[in-house]
């Protein structure tokens, strides 16, 4: 039973295997057929796709060909158009050249005709000239026979007579012209000067050496004086101004010949009284700040002055010098007002004479800058001012006008006499100057300069109208013993070299300070 079952199983397996093989062969055959069909279909599609691509490419190639053909035709048309234009221009040019040649030929023919006519006329004139010369020679011979003189002798007599007559008439005419010119020149000069003076209106300016500082009450005087006078001494030492506190109600008098120092003292007092803190350290601080403020104001005054007068391109140092003129005087006349007046006069006079107005005003404004520097110089102020002008690049005409307005050097331009005349007009006005005041101020300056001539002197201030000279020395260079000797030497030099009324008290002040800063 088992064997039969096994045999049947084996036969079944064999039969199944055979059947599987048959089925597998059948499937493979079907797959091959399907693959062939699919391959045929793909090949057919590929052929169709290739045909379509081929048609598209052919179509694109045709379109590109048409496009290139169109562009080529346009290029050819443009080129043909340009060629046609060039040919037209060439034809026009040829026509123009032909016309020009025709005109030139016509002109040449006319020129040749006129030349021939001219030559004929020259021949006729030559014949007539020969006849005239022959006739002239014949008449000249007849005149020589009649007059008994040769032609040369007759010419000489005629020329001499004409010379004498012409000389007489010329001398008479020259004399009349000179007299008329003198009369006219005097009249015109007077007219110009009168018109110039009438067109400038200025105030009478008289400087003094005293300023009055008004206070609200007399109680302020005690605070200004300070304990044992230390505040007033510190203020006088810092400013170089004599401060007079007397019985004048609600007023303190500031006395100093230098207007800059006096103004610094006045402004410093105003700040101290307004602030209320008055002591030596505060006084020195306020005076230093006020001096800086005055320097800034000087520059501002200089700028405003040159702008008002229409002067441009002035060196900053010269602008500062112009500003310092506000605090200088000449024979009692404020130097800035005087220089402004001279500048305006020069401008008006230059306009009347047809000269450079701006250059004339510039020279007029700067003509007295030699009076401004604080340092003493042996040169006259006109030459010193000329040196300053040359140093800061002013033109030669301006420099010469500055240096020659008091005849120290030769005048080399027309501006120089104008500046000289206008300076004289400004200074010669009635009430314009007071020579006594100027000589007084010069005496005080000379007094201070005597002290500055000694070694170790830091500051020197002439006060009490020149009756006292306060000298502040450097403690490192001058000892206490030397201070007394220095006072004696200064007094002896003043007595020897200067002329002064009364007596001059020389006070030498030596102060030692030790300063440290706590940080």
From Swiss-Prot:
CDD domains associated with the record: HDc (cd00077), KH-I_RNaseY (cd22431)
A GO term, aspect molecular function: RNA binding
Every KH domain range: 209-275
UniProt keyword list: Cell membrane, Endonuclease, Hydrolase, Membrane, Nuclease, RNA-binding, Transmembrane, Transmembrane helix
TM regions (residue ranges): 3-23
GO biological process terms, semicolon-separated: mRNA catabolic process
Hydrolase in keyword set: yes
Record flagged with keyword Secreted: no
Pfam families reported in the protein's UniProt record: HD, KH_1, RNase_Y_N
EC number(s) on file: 3.1.-.-
Location of this chain's protein in the cell: Cell membrane
A cellular-component GO term for this protein: plasma membrane
Start and end residues of each HD domain: 335-428
Family note: Belongs to the RNase Y family.
Physiological role: Endoribonuclease that initiates mRNA decay.
Protein name per Swiss-Prot or TrEMBL: Ribonuclease Y
Organism whose genome encodes this protein: Flavobacterium johnsoniae (strain ATCC 17061 / DSM 2064 / JCM 8514 / BCRC 14874 / CCUG 350202 / NBRC 14942 / NCIMB 11054 / UW101)
